[in-house]
């Protein structure tokens, strides 16, 4: 596959010990330019940390983690197709294509600690299903359903509201993912970015045509270290995964919102660094 990377300085972190964050891009095999953020450099024996955002969110939602992790780890945050600064194509909004995008992004890398939040966790599992675990050191799933019981509630009404008034529904959605809402300017920026993707493409990401057992089987069979970080909405799924896959590490954030790594960054970052240290 032909790939090229073009970088420009995005920003310089104000903390002296933090690395610069660079925005780069690469071209997929179907011709799409996907953007990502990169911070830090490779450290001997340390895994490369790759961060996957959730539904319609940009990679920069991990900005605190990029700054923190890059002190010791090469850290990357991908903008999936149609999200963040990546190209918005007319097609490719399927689990298979987006897992392929991730595969192509990781081709030049190894010893990866892959962290997927929400939809990013589902797509990380699809990557494992399609391409295996040879490049992975471990996997972290952040507040994502894994197909265990109980099932999440129906999203039918949300989809109807989204079609009827996308901007209003997105504003409500973005506010709801935080227990401690950020300033309105930041919410507006996240909403504005989320509207880049066409309505039906956005909703297609919520309707991957797989039985819940598909995800359950992937995660139960995952043979490398696995950390499942959840809020109370997935507490029962986490307990059942622990029962069915005892090696799974589980951490519950009782007071955080869905974007728990934004609400409680110090606790989340310490948890990930402790987990990553055991992989070195």
Task: State what each model feature region is.
Residues 29, 37, 67, 77-115, ...:
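Active-site loop/oxyanion-hole signature of alpha/beta-hydrolase fold enzymes
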Residues 125-166:
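Flexible "cap/lid" loop of the alpha/beta hydrolase fold
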Residues 149-153, 164-221:
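Conserved alpha/beta-hydrolase catalytic His-Asp/Glu region
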Residues 32-87:
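Conserved HGGG/HGGXW glycine-rich cap/lid loop of the alpha/beta-hydrolase fold
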Residues 256-269:
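Catalytic histidine-centered segment of alpha/beta-hydrolase-like enzymes
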Residues 199-252:
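Conserved serine/cysteine hydrolase catalytic core
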Residues 53-55, 116-121:
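Conserved alpha/beta-hydrolase "nucleophile elbow" surrounding the catalytic nucleophile
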Residues 19-33:
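N-terminal cap/lid segment of alpha/beta-hydrolase-fold proteins
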């Amino acid at each position: 596959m032909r790939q090229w990377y073009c970088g420009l300085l995005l920003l310089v972190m104000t903390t002296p010990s933090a690395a610069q964050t660079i925005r780069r891009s690469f071209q997929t095999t179907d011709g799409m330019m996907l953007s990502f953020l990169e911070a830090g450099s490779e450290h001997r024996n340390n895994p490369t940390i790759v961060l996957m955002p959730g539904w319609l969110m940009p990679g920069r939602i991990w900005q605190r983690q990029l700054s923190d992790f890059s002190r010791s780890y090469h850290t990357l945050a991908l903008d999936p197709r149609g999200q963040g600064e990546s190209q918005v194509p007319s097609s490719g909004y399927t689990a298979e294509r987006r897992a392929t995008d991730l595969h192509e992004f990781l081709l030049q890398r190894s010893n990866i600690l892959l962290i997927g939040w929400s939809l990013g966790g589902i797509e990380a599992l699809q990557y494992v299903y399609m391409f295996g675990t040879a490049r992975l050191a471990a996997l972290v799933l952040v507040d994502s359903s894994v197909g265990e019981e109980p099932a999440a509630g129906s999203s039918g009404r949300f989809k109807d509201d989204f079609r009827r008034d996308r901007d209003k529904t997105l504003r409500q959605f973005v506010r709801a993912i935080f227990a401690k809402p950020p300033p309105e300017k930041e919410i507006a920026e996240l909403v504005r970015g989320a509207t880049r993707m066409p309505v039906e493409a956005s909703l297609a990401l919520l309707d991957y045509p797989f039985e819940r057992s598909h995800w359950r089987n992937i995660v139960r069979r995952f043979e490398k270290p696995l950390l499942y970080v959840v809020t109370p909405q997935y507490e029962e799924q986490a307990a059942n995964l622990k029962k069915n896959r005892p090696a799974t590490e589980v951490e519950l954030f009782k007071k955080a919102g869905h974007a728990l790594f934004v609400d409680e960054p110090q606790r989340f970052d310490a948890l990930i660094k402790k987990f990553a240290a055991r992989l070195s």
